[in-house]
């Protein structure tokens, strides 16, 4: 099993470096006009700071993700600026997990002089604005936009890489295949698998598709596949069908709000399988009105465990909690923190300065990210390929006594 977690998880693609550099060629298309009333500006940087922009859901049902990214990114910017080397100024906008809102946020960030981007927090908005990063020759790295459509023009076929949009998070295909292989290596979790996924969401469907393929390769038995769309909140039919099929493990490649509803409704009907999710379920313990005792024993695949004992994680968690009213950081926060530090490492190595054009900064960032190794909260010896996919090992996390703890490898 340990050998699996050490293998390369990024998909090997054939696009060449020329494509990446082409995405950053020419002059800057970013506006240098002054920004007014930004949703969030942080950094306390000196004059000459490199302007970083980003957007995510700060309001609405996915706000736990966006606010975690915002807090962690602000924290990283302030720490980096205090060191006196490369200086950043951060502007972060609310996109409400909506593609049109994300496009509006992009325009605001561009008008504010954005030179490098943290892209978007969630996948659907990311897929909508990634072509704009390529068009404007602005380098972007998303902490958590995991769909292939965020970094590929053809997300389903995983072709046509933008070349200048990178991911810090696992891609959806890797989450699906990684989950299946972990479950296969731990047969005590369950032998008959049911899946409930959101079939109008590229994130959810993308994970399911690769989970199903890998499950077949690993000899897992999927006895039921249930779907839902939009804002559906009644899952009694799907749960009843899964229970009738004898499923003793329920795989949920979905976000935390519907996951909390599924756990609640399963409990009411006396259905108690092992629940297994991915990064979108990180945050379920913070759902308002949810009985968190129902999440006891839930498994998640994630790159970050807040209860890890290494000093870097402990310091990050302590500082984050001090800024976030005692809230424990999720993996979205950790990925965002890593994004900012990876950008700082790349900027320092490339000698990037604020007076450079977006295109020149973009080319320098692509060159650095495709050649450097980065150590962060969410992985050691991380690397990126020319398509923007990251290579790092996932970890399984278990909810125990109301806390996230490392699960067996």
What are these regions (language model features)?
Residues 10-18:
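Hydrophobic helical h-region of N-terminal Sec-dependent signal peptides
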Residues 1-11:
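Bacterial N-terminal signal peptides that target proteins for export
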């Amino acid at each position: 099993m340990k050998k699996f977690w050490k293998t390369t998880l990024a998909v090997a693609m054939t696009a060449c470096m020329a494509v990446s550099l082409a995405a950053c060629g020419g002059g800057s298309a970013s506006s240098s006009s002054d920004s007014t009333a930004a949703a969030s500006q942080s950094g306390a940087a000196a004059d000459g700071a490199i302007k970083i922009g980003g957007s995510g859901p700060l309001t609405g049902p996915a706000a736990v993700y966006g606010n975690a990214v915002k807090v962690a990114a602000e924290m990283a910017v302030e720490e980096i600026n205090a060191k006196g080397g490369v200086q950043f100024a951060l502007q972060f906008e609310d996109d409400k997990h909506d593609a049109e809102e994300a496009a509006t946020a992009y325009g605001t960030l561009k008008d504010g002089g954005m030179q490098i981007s943290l892209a978007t927090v969630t996948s659907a908005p990311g897929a909508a604005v990634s072509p704009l990063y390529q068009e404007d020759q602005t380098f972007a790295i998303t902490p958590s936009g995991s769909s292939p459509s965020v970094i590929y023009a053809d997300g389903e076929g995983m072709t046509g890489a933008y070349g200048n949009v990178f991911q810090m998070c696992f891609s959806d295909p890797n989450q699906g295949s990684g989950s299946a292989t972990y479950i296969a290596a731990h047969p005590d979790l369950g032998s008959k698998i049911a899946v409930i996924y959101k079939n109008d969401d590229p994130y959810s469907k993308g994970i399911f598709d690769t989970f199903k393929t890998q499950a077949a390769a690993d000899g897992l038995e999927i006895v039921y596949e249930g779907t839902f769309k939009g804002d559906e909140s009644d899952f009694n039919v799907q749960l009843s069908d899964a229970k009738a099929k004898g499923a003793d493990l329920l795989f949920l490649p979905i976000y935390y709000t519907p996951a909390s509803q599924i756990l609640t409704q399963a409990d009411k009907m006396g259905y108690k399988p092992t629940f297994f999710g991915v990064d979108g379920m990180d945050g379920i313990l913070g759902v308002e009105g949810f009985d968190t005792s129902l999440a006891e024993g839930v498994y998640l695949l994630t790159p970050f465990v807040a209860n890890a004992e290494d000093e870097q994680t402990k310091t990050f968690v302590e500082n984050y909690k001090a800024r976030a009213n005692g809230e424990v950081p999720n993996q979205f926060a950790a990925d965002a923190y890593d994004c900012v530090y990876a950008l700082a490492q790349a900027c320092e190595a490339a000698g990037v300065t604020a007076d450079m054009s977006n295109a020149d900064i973009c080319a320098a960032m692509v060159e650095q990210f495709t050649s450097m190794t980065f150590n962060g909260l969410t992985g050691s010896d991380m690397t990126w390929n020319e398509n923007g996919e990251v290579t790092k090992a996932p970890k399984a996390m278990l909810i125990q006594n109301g806390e996230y703890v490392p699960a067996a490898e």
